[in-house]
Regions:
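Alpha/beta-hydrolase-fold serine-hydrolase catalytic core, especially in secreted/extracellular enzymes
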Residues: 180-182, 189-340, 347-353, 357-364, ...
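Gly/Ser-rich "nucleophile elbow"/oxyanion-hole loop immediately N-terminal to the catalytic nucleophile
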Residues: 32-81
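Extracytoplasmic/secreted cell-surface and envelope-processing proteins
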Residues: 27-32, 86, 125-129, 150-153, ...
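Loop/turn elements at helix/coil->beta-strand transitions in domains of secreted/extracellular proteins
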Residues: 14-19, 71-74, 111-115, 136-141, ...
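Active-site-adjacent alpha-helix of alpha/beta-hydrolase-fold enzymes
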Residues: 133-211
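Short glycine-enriched nucleophile-adjacent loop
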Residues: 84-96
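A conserved short beta-strand
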Residues: 98-121
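Active-site machinery of serine-nucleophile hydrolases
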Residues: 2-30, 38-46, 172-175, 179
Length: 401
């Protein structure tokens, strides 16, 4: 695909071979007008592995132009959109003995795939065994634009959550959510219109970064990621932890970063069970006081669920006047949420990481709906209280006359 030539030229200048595999023919053709391929991303992933097989053959074929010139011990896969999901399937298929939906189709790849890059990927278009794809011990980078009008939810974050590191080697996964980036401008041919005619007028194109700036972001993150995962140049790791470390290279915009490496030890990720007092670590304990909201639930994206859970905590102080401050609340009524762990020893390179976001829900959810406690009691028409009030109203009316 010539739309990625800019990326190929950059990587080639850094000693990395980039081969673009055109799989657009799988999207459909005129012959599919009454029904074509569906849920075909497994085919895309399989096709990538078959291409790698050919490259391995060329590397070993005497007299071939590429004989001995390919470092087959250091391989990476890059995909965009549906291809962004396909590279995840390829990484999963690479270590399997059979196609997961049909054991009559044997696999025997086992290539040295060190890393995967997903640009604005979809997720769940193909589900092996009716489950979402997941793979282990391969580094992962996902880039997604906040103004993506094609894949409008940050679907690569779902794949991010499912990646695990289990061996003794160093791996990491990173996510970068970019304000002003759309779906198409990572490819020089796709352009600014993510929806296609006649819906272009529905898009606010003024929010977009320029195509040059968006492609620069792709160049910086992808080349740095491959330098780390294929060449072990870990001096670029800080870029994926904090985008401000790349301010000299990156265009001016907002970057939201996620990062987790194989040394990461979760304390409380809220995915382990439904016990609000437990932590991911078996030796931890949670306590909470005076919280009006305390629950754990699935995180919602724009259109889907993220595939992981979070703590939702809220509190509400009924202050009597606008001038009141937190200092007027007795200590016994202060809200708190605490994670208690046994004493542990950590070295100076360790960091405690919190991931937090503001919720738009009410801090007093039990004041309305089925939880309402302060609704006036419904009076019985024959009750003594009702009769007494009626009598008093009648007396007042007589006085007015």
């Amino acid at each position: 695909d010539p739309g990625y030539a800019y990326l190929g030229e950059l990587l080639a200048s850094r000693g990395i071979i980039l081969a673009s595999v055109d799989e657009n023919f799988i999207n459909g053709s005129w012959s599919d007008i009454f029904g074509g391929l569906e849920e075909e991303n497994d085919a895309r992933g399989w096709l990538l592995l078959e291409h790698l097989k050919v490259w391995h053959q060329w590397n070993k074929t005497g007299g071939h132009l590429l004989q001995g010139k390919i470092d087959t011990a250091n391989l990476a896969l890059i995909g965009h959109s549906r291809g962004g999901e396909a590279v995840a399937h390829a990484a999963m298929f690479n270590k399997l003995p059979f196609y997961p939906d049909d054991a009559s189709v044997p696999f025997d790849y086992n290539f040295n795939i060190k890393s995967v890059v997903a640009i604005a990927p979809v997720d769940g278009q193909y589900e092996p065994g009716e489950s979402r794809a997941k793979f282990e011990d391969v580094s992962y980078l996902v880039l997604h634009g906040a103004q993506d009008a094609d894949v409008s939810s940050y679907m690569g974050s779902q794949q991010y959550e499912r990646i695990r590191f289990t061996d003794s080697l160093y791996h990491f996964k990173a996510g970068v959510y970019v304000y002003g980036a759309n779906h198409g401008q990572f490819n020089t041919s796709w352009g600014e219109n993510d929806t296609g005619n006649p819906f272009t007028g529905l898009l606010n194109l003024k929010q977009l970064l320029s195509a040059e700036d968006q492609q620069k972001i792709g160049e910086v993150y992808i080349s740095s990621f491959l330098d780390i995962t294929l060449k072990n140049k870990r001096e670029y790791l800080p870029l994926f932890i904090d985008a401000r470390r790349g301010r000299e290279w990156l265009p001016e915009t907002i970057f939201l970063s996620q990062f987790e490496d194989s040394s990461f030890e979760p304390v409380a990720n809220y995915d382990e069970d439904f016990n609000l007092a437990s932590t991911t670590r078996e030796d931890g304990k949670v306590t909470g006081e005076n919280l009006s909201v305390w629950r754990e639930q699935e995180i919602k994206l724009k259109w889907e669920k993220k595939g992981s859970r979070a703590l939702f905590a809220g509190w509400n102080y009924a202050l009597e006047a606008p001038s009141d401050s937190i200092g007027s609340v007795p200590d016994s009524l202060l809200a708190s949420y605490a994670i208690r762990l046994p004493a542990m020893v950590v070295d100076s390179s360790a960091a405690l990481v919190f991931s937090m976001a503001e919720s738009t829900e009410s801090a007093t959810p039990k004041s309305e709906g089925k939880w309402a406690r302060d609704k006036p009691e419904k009076k019985d028409a024959n009750s003594d209280t009702d009769k007494e009030e009626t009598k008093k109203e009648g007396e007042e009316n007589e006085d007015e006359k």
